[in-house]
């Protein structure tokens, strides 16, 4: 199921650059700035793309990984066999792989990692990726067999997620502050509120990193981000938070500006169980009250692509459904009146730190106010957002970019933070997993896109672009 996963924000441009010989030819160290600091350093127990931006592929690796064209290629597993009925996968691991603490990585570690991810007490934010696993058995030290309850055409894809990396049981107790993986870089230091430092893994089993060290610097304020780049305090800023400054960088021969697309569906996430947002007419009214292009222009200075469902526009199975939620404030007012809210209502709008959320939130609040919906805005730090919104579901509206690869399946999870419960959609997603025919899968994915678009589960805003400024 190849997609353009090389464009993922989760597989950050910074992460990819760290092992690039060309990128590092003139220097032995690199300082990359990011706006978001990870809440902790365990990618298997948090829904924070900020963790993967630093650690995925650099420190931690999975059985499979994404190639630059989005296809699935070997990772820690050098090869695999799939049973005729598609219900078992036998992975053959690379020999000589060690964790950064010097211990060997073997089939027992794979079993531990997958069993931990799928266990009843699992804190993995993407636990659904592992739900179909019925057994993980060690065949020999370099061979592991994974049995599934039913064929799953997405299984190898799922194993490439940052949530599916392989960890060692001996180091799991301190993983949130001292992560130990198998990657080309190993964790060195975390000065919270400032930076994370990685150093080259001299014993890496694969192609060695070109850099000796890499530092991820966290700069949340757009003004400070601009100042840091102009002073050349950092070598690159991935997802630069002040797009209004990009023309100035483009005109300066010291810098280059690279704008890439992502898998990041930026949405006005809606609590589907909180009245009156549990009323589809109210959600539809919100959708028609939003001028997406005005948000892209005002918050992102024109960088971004409007969407009408939770699917990346560059995906071959994408269906353009933006007309379903076209800007129409008069229709929004009519729908509110039909739902019994002629005079509008009040709700909360809780915003995480990214600029697209903070800036976009102010614009959306004004657009909703114009049709009678009053929002109480709260600006949250990332850890607060994860606790209150993602885990606690204590919100009415929020804005966030879902950067996981082709993650429309989250709408089949009633316990997910927007609490959408549609049995027909859940059945469709279950049936999709057992399908391998490309045409059939495409039709099912387009049907899924249509269902959530017409149910107005969330306000679908735009596909996040990633502007990177580098020296």
What are these regions (language model features)?
Residues 200, 251, 258, 277-366, ...:
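Append "and occasionally in soluble cytosolic enzymes with long acidic Gly/Pro-rich linkers
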Residues 78-123, 139, 145, 276:
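Aromatic- and charge-enriched surface segment that lines or borders ligand/interaction sites
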Residues 37-53, 76-77, 103, 125-126, ...:
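A structural "hinge/loop" feature
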Residues 173, 201-247, 365, 374-376:
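Ligand-site clamp/hinge motif
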Residues 33-84, 115, 180-182:
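N-terminal lobe/hinge region of extracytoplasmic solute-binding protein
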Residues 27, 191, 289-317, 355-365, ...:
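Detector for C-terminal structural segments
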Residues 71, 151, 157-209, 213, ...:
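Gly/Pro-rich hinge or "lid" segments in bacterial periplasmic/extracellular proteins
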Residues 92, 126-169:
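Surface-exposed binding/hinge segments that line
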């Amino acid at each position: 199921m190849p997609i353009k996963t090389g464009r993922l924000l989760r597989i950050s441009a910074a992460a990819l650059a760290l092992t690039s010989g060309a990128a590092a030819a003139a220097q032995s160290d690199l300082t990359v700035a990011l706006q978001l600091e990870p809440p902790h350093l365990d990618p298997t127990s948090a829904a924070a793309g900020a963790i993967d931006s630093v650690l995925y592929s650099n420190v931690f690796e999975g059985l499979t990984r994404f190639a630059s064209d989005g296809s699935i290629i070997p990772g820690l597993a050098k090869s695999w066999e799939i049973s005729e009925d598609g219900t078992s996968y036998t992975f053959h691991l690379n020999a000589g792989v060690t964790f950064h603490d010097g211990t060997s990585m073997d089939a027992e570690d794979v079993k531990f990692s997958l069993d931990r991810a799928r266990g009843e007490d699992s804190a993995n934010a993407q636990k659904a990726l592992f739900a179909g696993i019925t057994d993980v058995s060690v065949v020999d030290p370099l061979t592991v067999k994974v049995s599934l309850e039913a064929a799953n055409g997405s299984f190898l894809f799922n194993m490439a997620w940052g949530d599916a990396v392989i960890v060692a049981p001996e180091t799991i107790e301190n993983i949130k502050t001292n992560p130990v993986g198998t990657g080309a870089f190993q964790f060195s230091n975390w000065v919270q509120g400032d930076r994370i430092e990685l150093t080259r893994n001299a014993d890496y089993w694969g192609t060695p990193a070109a850099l000796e060290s890499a530092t991820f610097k966290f700069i949340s304020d757009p003004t400070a981000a601009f100042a840091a780049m102009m002073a050349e305090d950092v070598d690159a800023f991935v997802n630069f938070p002040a797009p209004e400054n990009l023309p100035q960088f483009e005109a300066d021969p010291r810098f280059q500006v690279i704008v890439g697309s992502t898998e990041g569906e930026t949405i006005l996430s809606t609590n589907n169980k909180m009245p009156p947002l549990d009323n589809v007419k109210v959600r539809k009214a919100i959708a028609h009250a939003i001028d997406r292009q005005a948000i892209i222009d005002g918050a992102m200075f024109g960088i971004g692509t409007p969407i009408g469902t939770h699917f990346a526009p560059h995906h071959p199975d994408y269906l353009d459904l933006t007309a379903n939620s076209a800007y129409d404030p008069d229709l929004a007012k009519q729908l509110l009146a039909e739902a019994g809210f002629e005079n509008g209502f009040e709700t909360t709008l809780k915003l995480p730190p990214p600029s697209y959320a903070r800036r976009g939130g102010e614009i959306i609040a004004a657009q909703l106010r114009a049709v009678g919906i009053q929002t109480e805005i709260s600006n949250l730090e990332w850890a607060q957002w994860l606790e209150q919104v993602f885990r606690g579901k204590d919100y009415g509206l929020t804005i966030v970019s879902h950067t996981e690869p082709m993650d429309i399946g989250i709408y089949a999870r009633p316990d997910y933070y927007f609490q959408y419960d549609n049995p027909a959609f859940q059945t469709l997603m279950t049936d999709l997993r057992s399908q391998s025919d490309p045409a059939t899968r495409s039709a099912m994915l387009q049907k899924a896109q249509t269902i959530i678009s017409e149910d107005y589960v969330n306000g679908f805003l735009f596909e996040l672009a990633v502007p990177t400024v580098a020296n």
